UniProtKB/Swiss-Prot annotation:
Domain topic, free-text comment: The Q motif is unique to and characteristic of the DEAD box family of RNA helicases and controls ATP binding and hydrolysis.
GO CC list: nucleolus
InterPro entries associated with the record: DEAD/DEAH_box_helicase_dom, Helicase_ATP-bd, Helicase_C-like, P-loop_NTPase, RNA-helicase_DEAD-box_CS, RNA_helicase_DEAD_Q_motif
Protein name: ATP-dependent RNA helicase mak5
Gene: mak5
């Protein structure tokens, strides 16, 4: 046992000696290094702190510098503060290049100058060459000149081996012919050539567009330009500021999108000719939109032209709320066209560094739906953006005069393009007010221009005002109607109108978010495919609703219940019917709501469900919108008479669906209020009794007491009663609406048996129903 212990002691002693040797060797390396890593303030690699573009009050904090990854060291016996690198960070990373200690660069022998062979190699490498392989050899030779002479022979052998490995790679380098081929035209061009050539675009040739854009228009089946495109594209290409007014669905997006892409192609050709390859490019256009849906639609339409145009690789950055700010900032770095809503655009520009100065270099500023963006009390960020683009920075530093002159030049080069279907400020006034009202011509050119000149800083004193349809703001193929009913019967008449128009993609507009939620559940209870869209929804949910509604594979009877967030710019093919559940508050809102149908020369219908208290506003609306009509009708909207038999037969369905919907909404609201009160009571440490609280609330008086009582009664409906109402409603919906036909003796009435068997006609009714004469 003693021998074993003796051996263990020797082994442990041997291991400890090894550890000591390792420690001594590391210490020896540190000693050989000759530098402990502690430096002064002057030796650190300080970096200047970048301030944001928008800083209202800096309070003198300019010229600040910072450094990361250092620890503060106070040597004993000295009051001077010194620094060293943090653990795990290289010591040299915190130093300036000139302050790296020279002891690290220890050589084995002295440098004895250049040899004759090296001089010859230097003369050969100074000759210009185009092959990238030789440039790498030149770098290695420059490094060899700094090495000692004893290591020269070994490095020459290594260099020859590297060259031997690199020589076969020369075969893989592209030839001069391959360099001339554009990367965007590889196999995509062959695929496009195999497809059909598109439509005849001879009508576009008079506008002087490039072959790339004409090719894209041909593939997109745009055979001829619309009136607004034919009138606006030439002056925009000539460099004029343009104010374009046209009816909804007339193609205003391409009226300003095509000139922007033409300028992009011209800029690209200029850079290719001058061989100017700049990695950092500033945007050429900023397009502002009032809603997120319109911004996404602008990206889609302009992106389709870019996709089908060979050689057009313009990048579009979309800046809208509801999405990641960091991702949008990254997209903005290399973007050519910026499209967004004013709130998010201003958030990105004001929080970034150097973004506002980049935006000052844009060639085009496009304000889409300008009357909405520039209206009083709305979109404060839009005014901030316009002010920032026109603001001149005054500096006291050397060269400030040159910067100011550059800003003035960029300001004079920027074109301002304004588009909308309505411009006059009077159309934005509320229709239900008691103020003075006249039915005179309110849409003249002079007042519209004065309104815009106050809001925007045009380059020209008098921009070109192009009014494609000065007489009416409504589309030519649009039919307008009105249904008069009691205020409590709007649900009934809405359902009846939907039954009259099966397989029609319908858009229902309301004035409140709560009405959207209630109507969506109400229509879904009636087994109708209804979707909701309002501003309180998450961005992904909004995009999902629009996608489901506009999908070609969707049910043709899909109904979208929306607020005025969908009234402007939403271009969805196949919308046949627009219903105004609430009368619009302003005339311009009615114009844009009705403009969702009858787009691009198609036909469509727009119907207002009007209660007696809304009639005054509707009369004023019709007089303002149709002020220039030849006939002097007091109400130019056509009055629709629905079949009273159908209205009475579907009333039971509507009543059950409304009760089910109101009960569900009331239960959700009561449970949410109870949860909030319960949580508040727990935080305060008091007892909460829901019944006692309801009794105290019921004793009070005031506005809204009747609504609260109805909600309380609706929430008290049990699950069994709800299930019974759902079963009864399901049974009613399984049957067709009988309009006076004997179900036992079908042949005795006005029933076409063959049409029933073939599935023709309106499947909602049993019997002959005359369509609305409208």
């Amino acid at each position: 046992m003693g021998q074993k212990r003796q051996r263990d002691q020797k082994g442990s002693g041997f291991q400890s000696k090894k550890r000591k040797r390792g420690a001594n060797s590391s210490n020896a390396d540190d000693k050989d290094d000759g530098w402990d890593g502690i430096v002064g303030v002057e030796d650190l690699n300080w970096k200047e702190v970048a301030l944001p573009d928008r800083l209202d009050d800096a309070e003198g904090f300019f010229g600040l510098e910072e450094i990361e990854g250092v620890d503060i060291v106070r040597p004993e016996g000295s009051g001077e503060i010194r620094f060293k690198a943090k653990a795990g960070k290289p010591k040299k990373s915190i130093l300036k290049n000139k302050t790296i200690p020279q002891e690290d660069k220890t050589f084995d022998d002295e440098w004895e100058g250049f040899s004759d062979g090296e001089a010859a190699q230097e003369t050969t490498t100074t000759e210009p060459t185009e092959e990238p392989v030789q440039t790498t050899n030149e770098e290695t030779e420059v490094k060899e000149k700094k090495e000692p002479k004893k290591k020269e022979a070994k490095k020459e052998v290594k260099k020859d081996a590297k060259n031997a490995k690199k020589e076969p790679k020369k075969k893989d380098l592209p030839s001069q012919k391959d360099k001339d081929i554009k990367p965007g035209l590889s196999f995509a061009a062959l695929q496009d050539a195999e497809e059909d050539d598109g439509v005849d675009i001879s009508a576009w040739e008079s506008l002087g567009l490039s072959p790339e854009i004409l090719n894209s228009l041909s593939k997109l089946k745009f055979s001829s330009p619309t009136a607004v495109q034919k009138s606006c594209i030439p002056p925009i290409l000539d460099g004029h500021d343009v104010v374009g007014k046209a009816s909804t669905g007339s193609g205003k997006t391409l009226a300003f999108g095509i000139p922007i892409l033409e300028y992009y192609l011209e800029k690209k050709r200029r850079e290719t000719k001058n061989k100017d390859d700049k990695k950092e490019t500033s945007p050429i256009a900023l397009i502002l939109s009032p809603t997120r849906e319109l911004a996404h639609q602008l990206v889609k339409h302009i992106g389709e032209v870019i996709t089908h145009a060979p050689g057009v690789n313009a990048r579009i950055a979309l800046l809208t709320g509801g999405l990641s700010v960091q991702k949008q900032q990254r997209l903005l770095n290399g973007a050519d066209i910026v499209i967004g809503t004013p709130g998010r655009v201003w958030e990105v520009l004001s929080g970034g560094q150097g973004l506002i100065s980049k935006m000052k270099e844009i060639k085009y500023l496009v304000v889409d739906e300008a009357d909405r963006l520039l209206s009083e009390g709305h979109f404060k960020e839009a005014h901030e953006i316009l002010a920032a683009l026109d603001r001149e920075e005054i500096n006291d530093f050397p060269g400030a005069e040159e910067d100011e002159s550059d800003d003035e030049d960029s300001k004079t080069q920027r074109q301002t393009l304004v588009f909308s279907a309505t411009f006059h400020r009077d159309l934005q006034q509320k229709l239900a007010g008691k103020g003075k009202w006249t039915g005179s011509d309110l849409m003249n050119k002079q007042e519209s221009m004065e309104y815009l000149l106050k809001k925007l800083n045009f380059r020209e004193e008098k921009p070109k005002f192009i009014d494609v349809n000065p007489v009416s703001q409504m589309a030519e193929g649009l039919k307008e109607g009105i249904v008069e009913c009691a205020a409590m019967e709007k649900d009934l008449y809405l359902y009846t109108l939907l039954l009259y128009h099966p397989k029609h993609r319908t858009l229902v507009f309301t004035n409140s978010i709560s009405a959207v939620r209630r109507l969506t559940q109400f229509l879904q209870a009636l087994q109708l495919p209804a979707l909701a869209l309002h501003s309180s929804m998450a961005q992904k949910a909004r995009l999902r609703s629009v996608e489901r509604f506009s999908s070609p594979t969707a049910d043709p009877s899909t109904i979208l219940v929306a607020t005025d967030v969908a009234a402007r710019g939403l271009d969805i093919k196949g919308i046949d019917f627009v219903i105004h559940y609430h009368a619009p508050r302003t005339a311009d809102t009615y114009v844009h709501r009705s403009g969702r149908t009858a787009r691009a020369g198609a036909s469509g219908k727009s119907v207002i469900i009007c209660a007696p208290e809304e009639m005054v506003g509707v009369v004023r609306l019709a007089a303002k919108v149709h002020a220039n009509m030849a006939n002097g009708k007091r109400l130019p909207l056509e009055s629709l008479e629905l079949d009273r038999r159908i209205v009475s037969r579907v009333k039971q369905r509507v009543t059950l669906a409304a009760r089910i919907c109101d009960a569900n909404i009331a239960k959700e609201k009561v449970s949410a209020e109870d949860n909030w009160l319960k949580n508040a009571a727990e935080e305060l440490g008091v007892d909460y009794d829901s019944e006692e609280f309801d009794e105290r609330q019921g004793r009070g008086r005031g506005r809204g007491r009747g609504r609260q009582q109805r909600e309380r009664q609706a929430s008290s409906i049990s699950k069994a009663e709800l299930a019974g109402m759902r079963a009864e409603l399901k049974q009613l919906l399984s049957q067709r609406v009988n309009v006076g036909v004997s179900e036992r003796y079908l042949t005795s009435g006005r029933v076409d048996i063959e049409a029933l068997l073939r599935g023709e006609g309106n499947a909602s009714f049993l019997g002959q129903v005359d369509p609305l004469g409208f």
